[in-house]
Amino acid sequence: MCEAMDFLREVIGDKLILGCGVPLGPAFGKVDYCRIGPDVGLNWDGSPKERLLHRERVSTKNTIGNTIYRRQLNGRAFWNDPDVYLLRDDNIRLSAKQKEMLAQVNGLFGGLLFTSDDVGTYDEEKRALQQSLSALREAPRSVERKGKYTIVRYQGQDGEKELRVKL
């Protein structure tokens, strides 16, 4: 895989490469952006059957975990692509809090911010959240593990904020 990534970089030259599905090690220094976890799901953690059969699966919960725990790669090995954030209300089974957490974690630790939503349908609150995400990249932050929770603290526009994520 390392030789394939070397070849790809040689052929592509200075064009931007977004690696998706590539093992992380061979992508170091070869791609500009790289997906760092699974696809975001339309619900929190898939069905019970999916959880029993597959560790690597579409899962918003797993996406958030990968984004937090692979944050050190961002800007060092490549820029992190944590997958899309979703704020929409239709065709989704994430709570408002889960959608906001996904967007904030992507803003804090992602090198790319993508959504597959029709942003033209966002209400004022969703537009404000979307517009605040890029500023999070520069926010001082810390991450610690306490029991079943991962706690992310960061400096928001109106003081210190805390995300408590049960992974």
Predicted regions and their residues:
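Glycan-recognition surfaces
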Residues: 3-121
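Polar/charged alpha-helical tracts
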Residues: 6, 10, 96, 124-134, ...
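Short, surface-exposed, charged/polar-biased interaction segments
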Residues: 22, 29, 38, 126-129, ...
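Short, charged low-complexity intrinsically disordered segments located at boundaries
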Residues: 35-40, 133-143, 158-163
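N-terminal functional modules and adjacent low-complexity/disordered segments of proteins
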Residues: 73, 82, 128-131, 147-149, ...
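Carbohydrate-binding surface patches
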Residues: 102, 106-114, 145-167
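Aromatic- and carboxylate-lined catalytic core of secreted/periplasmic carbohydrate-active enzymes
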Residues: 103-145
